[in-house]
């Protein structure tokens, strides 16, 4: 299954969740797109709820189905912690996501583009793989030639706060994952236990 490339505002309204993190998509119409979106209150089945949570989380992090499923299977092989918590941590420690969390990009799609185009380094080495798993202590930075990118400077200026598990140096435009995140620090709008239930039936 390919990655969705349509309007993110439609996804956000369909899920009732701001995928951009700004909340603008839901400010005027906090219901699903379509003429009857505001009055669509059909009861969702248990399977429908599981599927909805899976899609919500997958679209939030911008993964296609194969990438998402493979990461889920990998999380299940980690011996410590719960399957759901480990899955969330693996999603959160992707390089593209941490570029976004550090404020070097205004959205995850923009962060993924920065990584793909070779603007990002990890411990001084260029990394152009968005799915690269960042380890605590590793330093994420912009390449020298990318220091003055307008979209990056704008993103940094508009960043109000950053998660407690990262640090950022505004002067050097470098950041680091200081520790693995705890579940309570991650997306509260998602019930990953439903995602686990969904895949336990499918796989």
Curated annotation (Swiss-Prot):
Domain S4 RNA-binding: 93-156
Disulfides per UniProt: none
GO terms classed as biological process: ribosomal small subunit biogenesis; translation
GO CC terms, sorted: small ribosomal subunit
Keywords noted in UniProt: Ribonucleoprotein, Ribosomal protein, RNA-binding, rRNA-binding
InterPro entries for the chain: Ribosomal_uS4, Ribosomal_uS4_bac-type, Ribosomal_uS4_CS, Ribosomal_uS4_N, S4_RNA-bd, S4_RNA-bd_sf
Statement: the UniProt record of this protein carries the keyword Cell membrane: no
Any one GO molecular function term: rRNA binding
Function: One of the primary rRNA binding proteins, it binds directly to 16S rRNA where it nucleates assembly of the body of the 30S subunit.
Record-stated family: Belongs to the universal ribosomal protein uS4 family.
Subunit description: Part of the 30S ribosomal subunit. Contacts protein S5. The interaction surface between S4 and S5 is involved in control of translational fidelity.
Name assigned to this protein: Small ribosomal subunit protein uS4
Organism: Lacticaseibacillus paracasei (strain ATCC 334 / BCRC 17002 / CCUG 31169 / CIP 107868 / KCTC 3260 / NRRL B-441)
Gene of this entry: rpsD
